């Protein structure tokens, strides 16, 4: 389904289904056969959403497929790299004394329940009302308890989320730690710039920010990726990122942030694999995404 300016979704449709996909990949990385991360909530959340292919994935019912290149172990390693990057970001930020955390487009992220937060930490989760409600109720049914003070901000990021965040108690005069995981490709250029401008306006000196970005979204229309997607669709993986992401010219996010006083450090997906002791796959599909860039930044102004 091609995006529209005011489209909406839940966790089984459009952009929302990508949150379920990511949670399924986290569940795979947390599965005892790999045990690369600790996330006991990913699998039950995915099962509760009920998308067949992702339920089968977390249940171990989709084996290696040579023709499509699907390999559960490879998927687990890639998601472990991403998850560890954001986990470590929050651990380091809160150990430095930051006590308010904002998870933008939180989806099925369960960090408010699974990380060992210092006493007094407040975690704000920002996402669509339907997404926030589903996760909150499902985790309550599972008997899960937050390990920090969790405050939900049920708002579309295309609306005035900054006002909603402050109404929930966020203090812009206190340093904060922000994540925009798996978000930027789903925003048009002007919305991406506005997102970072809002983050900067709400951030005190010493605040931290983590995100990843795709340097060129044309990769989703690359012939190698299109062929891979067609083969994966036969296994039931039907999400077509080419329809969900926004293409075209974008501001260079690192340069944009630097102008506002953010000092950044970045690593490519290939570099993160090496840092985590994994070999980056040597094939055409992996090559398309080797330059996805993971960035952490500190506001110095």
Swiss-Prot record:
Pfam families: LCM. It comes from the Bacteria. Its EC number is 2.1.1.-. The keyword Transferase applies. GO terms for biological process: methylation. S-adenosyl-L-methionine binds at residues 127, 156-157. The keyword GTP-binding does not apply. Keywords: Methyltransferase, S-adenosyl-L-methionine, Transferase. Transmembrane segments: none annotated. InterPro entries: Ppm1/Ppm2/Tcmp, SAM-dependent_MTases_sf, SAM_mthyl_Trfase_ML2640-like. GO terms for molecular function: methyltransferase activity. It is an enzyme of class 2 (transferase). Belongs to the UPF0677 family. Exhibits S-adenosyl-L-methionine-dependent methyltransferase activity. This is Putative S-adenosyl-L-methionine-dependent methyltransferase MMAR_4850. The lineage of its organism: Bacteria, Bacillati, Actinomycetota, Actinomycetes, Mycobacteriales.
